[in-house]
Structures are given as C-alpha cells and as structure tokens.
Amino acid sequence: MANTYMKPGDQTFDELIGDIRHGVYLKTFMEWNIDDKRFNERYVGHEAYLIENGELTSYVRNPVLELTTPKLYSSVDAVSKEMEFDAGTCGKGDPMQGAPVYEGGPSVRLRNIRLGGGA
C-alpha cells in the first residue's frame, strides 16, 4: 500500500474557499477506493458542507466524487498550506485484514468536476 500526499501550497483554508461561488467541501470521507491500476477513483464524503459565496453553509449528505487520476491532478487549482493527518486502517480480503495507515494532507481546491449524491 502506498500513500501519496500533496505538497502544501501557499493559501490558508479561508483563502482557498474565499472565491468559490458554489461548491462542496468534503472534509472527511466514509469511503475511498482506487482500482489496481491506480486510474479510477471514488470518494464518498462523510462530513461535507455546501460552499456559497466563500462561506461554509449547510451540511451536504454523502456527496460522491468519481474521477480518474489524471482528471484529479489536472483539476487541482490551489492547495492550502495547512497539513492535517489522522490515523486510519486500510482493510482488504476475506478474512478481513487491516494495516494501520495515516491519511490526510492539505486541503485541495478542484475546478470543473462534478459530484454525485448518495442516500
């Protein structure tokens, strides 16, 4: 298992969202997957908020981001300077096996992507 982190940028979080007219901030994920070729990715938000005119407003339920790795990297518009990491577990197999991992990094602003929604 490999982890890749974005290099921190030069903006604060408030600067990162300050010029977003309408968007969604996915703060944490309840599901994230990438295929064996490291090409197709899927992220389901756990804690997510609507961004309206540069401000976090209401809660967004289970937003889904599905895209390819090239689309992810080409959509990065800005990266915050704050880094945040949390302990997690990567689990696979039958019987289930888990490996301790750290997840996180800076907040990243993506442009020109679409989100779906879940129930």
Where on the chain are the PLM-derived regions?
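N-terminal small-residue-enriched
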Residues: 1-119
